[in-house]
């Protein structure tokens, strides 16, 4: 939610509407969505390379450490999926278009604000590590945040202008004036965070002591994410809205000023609403009244009692209960163990695929992971008999169809995607948790087209990323080259390196090698950020990989977790993976890079051996050979298997002279064809 222009209006009148706070020794309810966006966009993180998740995790950790140092107890509340009415769909589509334009700008060296794909998952992982209390609401969180803050008599931290409308007992602290990086002390002992708190009383006093109860009507007349009626322009054009005394600053907010001054003349919302309707054609009045009243309800207390979740672990949401969803699904959603992507697919049979900083001239990067989503949709098909009566009643029966809002060029379109019909024991969502670990793991790996034996030498924490990488390599849409795969696998070594460095039992020599390699990775990452131009094709390839990982994680969560969830904060760093690509293309070899740390070298070999059997043969050819090989294949028109066999015979020990990659052992390429045919 959010009221257009209101936040900048109140900030223009900061001295009148805000009071200074020294925040300490209190609970605080935090709008999680607003916080992770704010931290992502205000921390000098590079947004071009698909996410420096390690750096973002560090920022999130420092933020909460500042709160802890001031004895501030945070409770983070995250938005869930869209509600059953889907009333924000138009707004969401508009935002999706805006994100595409910003992603395009970033991709060609311009500016823009686009969250990396896995930022929400990283944020939740950091909350869990720090033991910060959090909940994921079933749908939009604003009302639940307001209700909880009033129950606990504590402030709200957000950047959403709707919190200027809610009647909050202890007030609303905007994130942009919450100076957590500039912690101060009282008498040299008690830490506090300087902040500003919005005063609703001062705001209403400024407008002739207007009744607070009029503000929800102001919000819907002004236009928020839920209401944007063209007919309201009729009212605004006919009503002579008094601007009052306006400064040069106030002219850009003439609609806000006019509405507030006009509304301040009425005693209550009923009187004001009747006067609004007078300006509209009689035939429209009843419908408009119903819509406005319904939208004003969005600013009332919520029925959800989040304090029960934080104190007892019970989350009761009437809207969710009315849908008859399985209990385990509701619990997993509240705990953030299932993504809002799942609830959108479940409730609306519609998902929105977020754009990344990718090549806009190519098909969107999420195309590659569509088969994984089709399995997810198949698992959600028979979730509840109530869903067909609610979300799907206006459409002709399409029992296997889901819709996806996706990027096409620099716009969006809605595509109809068929779900995969699964075996009977997989198609009952309520009983999915009863399936054995073996069955759930089998479904996950069959979807990813990976043999379980391939993953046996892989550390538990990397099994899912490696399985996803095998899936990614098998798809023809992926134009990955050897250096892309190598860079990705090298980046996966960061977590194990940190573990070696922090392990007290390791010998000094091992620790030194790990420290040196980690320092080299940090140097590469820093060098990449200095301004090298983004390689769009490389960016697109890694966007495809991230999409596969995201959907692989969502399927893994839904099954639930037959493989451990990877630590995203140490798994992928966009700046590092792009920098390693450049180095491997220029001169460095993997062998020379890893020579300083034998443990990392051994792990890399395990990862490489697992993935190489799923890679197309041409990925291992020296530069210049791949294209000629393709031409030769066309000319000879031989079968795929014969070509693979012949390639293997000729490329068992290629030495890639240009890049000094050393010997690339590819004697097991035949396994690729076997692994693609999972039973």
Swiss-Prot record:
GO terms for biological process: double-strand break repair via homologous recombination; double-strand break repair via nonhomologous end joining. Interacts with SHLD1, SHLD2, SHLD3, RIF1 and MAD2L2/REV7. Residues 626-635 have a biased composition (Basic residues). The keyword Hydrolase applies. It comes from Pongo abelii (Sumatran orangutan). One of its GO terms (molecular function) is 3' overhang single-stranded DNA endodeoxyribonuclease activity. Structure-specific DNA endonuclease that specifically cleaves single-stranded DNA and 3' overhang DNA. Contributes to the control of DNA double-strand break repair choice by antagonizing BRCA1-dependent homologous recombination (HR) and promoting non-homologous end-joining (NHEJ). Recruited to the single-stranded DNA ends by SHLD2 and cleaves the 3' exposed DNA ends, therefore inhibiting DNA end resection (necessary for HR) and promoting DNA end protection (necessary for NHEJ). It is an enzyme of class 3 (hydrolase). The lineage of its organism: Eukaryota, Metazoa, Chordata, Craniata, Vertebrata. It holds the Pfam family XPG_N. This is Single-strand DNA endonuclease ASTE1. Its EC number is 3.1.-.-. PANTHER family: ASTEROID PROTEIN, PROTEIN ASTEROID HOMOLOG 1. Residues 625-645 are annotated as: Disordered. Residues 351-400 are annotated as: Interaction with SHLD2. The keyword Nucleotide-binding does not apply. Belongs to the asteroid family. It comes from the Eukaryota. Keywords: Hydrolase.
